[in-house]
A protein has these predicted regions:
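Collagen/collagen-like triple-helix recognition
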Residues: 1-20
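Extracellular jelly-roll beta-sandwich "head" domains, especially the C-terminal globular C1q domain
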Residues: 15-188
Length: 188
């Protein structure tokens, strides 16, 4: 039969979603984080510089990290104002490690306003990379994880990513060497 009449025009669409990605990588040199025998939270390593001497060798800091001016190169500047929606990280183990206790590698984000050297922990940005490590952890093991957020961010704001080992128990000193990449999705 004949084609029927054209229906009414539908409502205006919501428009395209605009996104920006902030990416971190440890580069060619493996990044090593360790967990002392008496600790349940290990030392920090800034993503972006596996050779940084600015790690904290006792507990992961609370709410803030103040970087020396020379270490600002490990933070990235956000290009747009929007909402941080998701963070994803991969860590590839580069050397065989032997763990006597179960531990997780964690990632966390900090932000600082433009012109500031003091970074504040971004609430809700802590997440564990899986699987947990225990026993023999061979080179080539991939740990990954992500977290969903809805945090406001501003153009010019700086972001710092860290990784650290954590365990529910004390035990032998543990360390993990690998390369890390982390990306944060900002929706405009």
């Amino acid at each position: 039969g004949p084609t029927g009449p054209t229906g009414p025009t539908g409502p205006q669409g919501a428009g395209a979603r605009t996104i920006s990605t902030a990416a971190f990588t440890s580069g060619d040199t493996p990044l090593t984080t360790s967990l002392a025998a008496e600790d349940t939270t290990g030392n920090l390593r800034y993503v972006g510089n596996a050779l940084s001497g600015q790690s904290t060798n006792d507990q992961v800091p609370g709410a803030q990290i103040t970087l020396p001016a020379a270490d600002m190169k490990y933070a990235i500047t956000l290009p747009t104002t929007g909402r941080l929606k998701e963070v994803y990280a991969d860590y590839v183990v580069t050397a065989l490690e032997q763990f006597t206790r179960s531990a997780h590698l964690y990632a966390r984000l900090y932000t600082a306003p433009s012109g500031s050297l003091t970074f504040t922990y971004l609430p809700g940005s802590d997440f564990a990379l899986s699987p947990a490590v225990s026993g023999n952890v061979p080179a080539g093991t991939v740990l990954s994880g992500s977290v969903m957020l809805d945090a406001p961010v501003s153009a010019g704001e700086k972001m710092l990513a860290i990784v650290y080992l954590g365990s529910d128990t004390t035990g032998d000193e543990e360390s993990l060497s690998g390369v890390v990449s982390l990306a944060a999705l900002v929706e405009v």
